[in-house]
Amino acid sequence: MELQISSAIIILVATFVASLLIKQWRKSESRQNLPPGPPKLPLVGHLHLLWGKLPQHAMADMAKKYGPVTHVQLGEVFSVVLSSREATKEAMKLLDPACADRFESIGTRIMWYDNDDIIFSPYSDHWRQMRKICVSELLSARNVRSFGFIRQDEMSRLLRHLQSSAGETVDMTERIATLTCSIICRAAFGAIINDHEELVELVKDSLSMASGFELADLFPSSKLLNLLCWNKSKLWRMRRRVDTILEAIVDEHKLKKSGEFGGEDIIDVLFRMQKDSQIKVPITTNAIKAFIFDTFSAGTETSSTTTLWVMAELMRNPAVMAKAQAEVRAALKGKTSVDVDDVQELKYMKSVVKETMRMHPPIPLIPRSCREECEVNGYKIPNKARIMINVWSMGRNPLYWEKPETFWPERFDQVSRDFMGSDFEFIPFGAGRRICPGLNFGLANVEVPLAQLLYHFDWKLAEGMKPSDMDMSEAEGLTGIRKNNLLLVPTLYKSP
């Protein structure tokens, strides 16, 4: 009996491997003028070259050898990595409609309600409508300013905590995450929900499994792998918990009047738009829940990640820290509150934030997918191909940046570059149709808290640590978060 079972398993595996090899051979016969890439292994393609490395690092190494448009075969998935300003501009501007899709993964499909959101939604009427609502109604510059009292209130809470912990080691990773989460909770829901900490953890776990590197994502034709995907059951458990939390939030908003607790929050706006007769594509409850999860995913993870990288780089570069603090303390002296308009004059601090995002982009590999066959840099890119723009690699390319491995904010004084999507070697928020619609909101949630952290406190590393001892490693996942928590010692600054 055991022999029969073993034989059946061997036959099943052999059949699976043979079918994949035949499929890859047939595909290779029809491929012409495709981007260059490293030699492939049967079945796995180039997956072995990513082993033990972060994908953006491994793909940067490939680009050095094979060029800025590199073919990377991820199992069955034909992928192209773009690592130059010119190729990125071609894909994200000149060919933007053709390259405007997102590739789907098991993680995004389960956690983001069949990709019924904005971040992972395919390019469609639904996506265009939700993005328009987001830009004009939810996260416009006017609305970002209207959330100023929330930022100030939550920042005051953090400052009080740091003041009471002066001279002690503080886990800034935890504190900044709490701050950002609280701001987003109040902007989205009108109040801090009871389950906000659990929701943040669910977001982190979801993003770590949303990068498209699950085996079932890399071999999509295999029903067996899809069935046996060991993370699938975990994802569904997480989805059920997320749905319980979001359903409660939605139900509570249905019962209350819009603005009952002081102003229209993001969910109030979505409910209002849901009833608008001008809406062409119906806004479902699942679409609202997916958008809420988007807000947490993009808002908490990227804003807190950038703030922590800024603080880490300032601790590694004391001269930059001193210059930034001098500017902030001169400009904000005597002010009782700080918000978006106040930080506009902090030119050097803004350069510090830019330099941080150059070296540590919130999304190191921006994912796209082809909606039709197209040509980039003279190479054929097949329909449905996965495209990854290596933002991390371009931010450290000596062709575009002098001393790219040096943290040097002054470089932005010499060359005018911004992250609004027109300088394609520097696109931490993306570019083209899919540029981040929450750019202004996210930036405000970095710059306003940062200015106050630099104004009110002097900072030291935990006892016994030197700047050269700091671990600046990145963690795995869709976002470029720090691998280890940032531990700092605040000392209250007293203005002379």
From Swiss-Prot:
It catalyses: (4S)-limonene + reduced [NADPH--hemoprotein reductase] + O2 = (1S,6R)-isopiperitenol + oxidized [NADPH--hemoprotein reductase] + H2O + H(+). It is a single-pass type II membrane protein. It is an enzyme of class 1 (oxidoreductase). Keywords: Endoplasmic reticulum, Heme, Iron, Membrane, Metal-binding, Monooxygenase, Oxidoreductase, Signal-anchor, Transmembrane, Transmembrane helix. It holds the Pfam family p450. Heme binds at residue 436. GO terms for molecular function: (S)-limonene 3-monooxygenase activity; heme binding; iron ion binding. InterPro entries: CYP450_71D (IPR052306), Cyt_P450 (IPR001128), Cyt_P450_CS (IPR017972), Cyt_P450_E_grp-I (IPR002401), Cyt_P450_sf (IPR036396). One of its GO terms (cellular component) is endoplasmic reticulum membrane. SUPFAM superfamilies: Cytochrome P450. Its EC number is 1.14.14.99. Its cofactor is heme. The chain crosses the membrane at residues 2-22. It is found in: Endoplasmic reticulum membrane. Belongs to the cytochrome P450 family. Hydroxylates both (+)- and (-)-limonene to (+) and (-)-trans-isopiperitenol. This is Cytochrome P450 71D95. It comes from Mentha spicata (Spearmint).
